[in-house]
Design a protein with these regions (language model features):
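Mature catalytic core of soluble alpha/beta enzymes
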Residues: 1-275
Length: 275
């Protein structure tokens, strides 16, 4: 078994797979890099930048990967009655978690996920100006794409881990340590043919105008301050990744929605976790 590691998606991505599959790992990393380029909030040539700059109501050509992620985002937006919203870019720019840029005036971007229309597999229309940030879902999609590539290359088993958002497949149990909000690993779960994602924000906050803000946004576009970790197990990493954000804001709702997506939440406490 070998493990390869690359910086990507704002974290480090590790791929563990059997010896002799180095070329497959390279192709998987290339798929991850493609997702990063297309869905970056920061890069001027990304699909998000094109949607941000487009005239409201204009059809915009984007990568099919971007369409797939936006389609899932819309589905989750409806399933959570609007709580999961990928147009939180305006809030994150205001609190300093995302760069403002020279052209961004926050009052010019009032749109929400319900204003996004999927035209076809390569075209999207935003009916109001908006700042889309896919940081709460794209990493999971990138992990899923890497797994698809590895399988297409004939790799029998592998683990793809993007900073704690991971997916495992094959005939083995992969031991996965769950890192709590304070950075300690107190619980290890076996991962077999599933995806696992965790979120917390104890170490990722800013003081803005006299109050703490985090990267996780809940009801009323307010920051969610969580001193605990939430962990979701699902069949796909895109679902696991997104549902951790919902669970931080409303655990009861997340548990209800998880049932619709063949997922489940792990019970957590300040010192560990249990099924």
């Amino acid at each position: 078994m070998i493990t390869r590691c690359r910086p990507s998606l704002g974290t480090f991505v590790e791929i563990s797979l059997p010896d002799g599959n180095e070329q497959a790992a390279e192709q998987a990393f290339a798929a991850i890099a493609h997702v990063h380029r297309r869905m970056s909030f920061h890069e001027s040539g990304s699909d998000l930048a094109r949607l941000r700059d487009a005239t409201p109501g204009k059809q915009v050509k984007v990568d099919r990967e971007t369409v797939a992620v936006l389609r899932m985002a819309i589905e989750l937006h409806h399933a959570t009655s609007g709580l999961f919203d990928v147009t939180i870019g305006r809030t994150l720019v205001r609190s300093g978690f995302l760069p403002r840029g020279e052209t961004i005036r926050l009052d010019h971007f009032p749109g929400t996920t319900r204003d996004i229309e999927i035209v076809d597999t390569h075209h999207v229309r935003c009916h109001r100006p908006m700042l889309i940030d896919l940081g709460g879902i794209a990493k999971g999609h990138a992990v899923d794409r890497a797994v698809e590539v590895l399988r297409s290359c004939g790799v029998a088993e592998a683990l793809v881990n993007a900073g704690g958002d991971l997916r495992a497949y094959g005939d083995r149990d992969w031991p996965v340590g769950l890192r709590d909000a304070d950075g300690e690993v107190r619980y290890v779960v076996p991962a077999r043919d599933c995806a696992i994602a965790s979120s917390s924000n104890l170490d990722n906050r800013r003081r803005v105008r006299g109050r703490d803000e985090s990267v996780h946004i809940g009801y009323g576009r307010k920051s969610v301050l969580a001193d605990h970790r939430v962990t979701v197990v699902a069949t796909t990493c895109i679902v696991a990744d997104a549902l951790t954000k919902v669970a931080l804001a409303d655990r009861v709702l997340a548990e209800q929605v998880a049932q619709q997506f063949d997922a489940r939440l792990l019970e957590t406490s300040s010192t560990g976790a249990s099924n």
